[in-house]
Amino acid sequence: MSYAGDLNPTEAWKLLNQDQSAQLVDVRTRPEWMFVGLPDLTSLGRRAVLQSWQVFPAMEVDDNFVAELAQQLPDMEAPILFICRSGGRSRAAAAALTAAGYRRCYNVAEGFEGNPDAERHRGKTGGWKAAGLPWVQD
């Protein structure tokens, strides 16, 4: 594994609650943030960092991702938790930041919505939303 490890959404929430230096980075696209929703960290006195791993609509990896995120999160020792829809993009982002020298990068393995259920709907069988963690939608 090329990053610190995988956390399920409940473990991620616990770490964010216990360690004020921990940051949650949502690497989904702007349309996903707008139409699907966002993790709500206001009860912890902060907000998720929004930095897309891929550029919409082409969905190519953003070559500036690491540099832009490093400007926002200069503490290379703080825990950084990456979340996407279901864990794939966030895993790649965690690996990229680890390769750049960040020491405690975690993937929220089930993501915000988790995998689809038998009816091909997300957000019901796994992920941040299904875990009953706080989230908001515009």
What positions do the PLM features span?
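Short, surface-exposed ligand- or partner-binding patches at beta-edge/loop junctions that are enriched
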Residues: 82-83
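Rhodanese-like catalytic fold shared by cysteine-dependent sulfurtransferases
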Residues: 1-23, 30-79, 90-138
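Conserved G/P- and acidic residue-centered "switch" motifs that form tight phosphate/ATP-binding loops
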Residues: 87
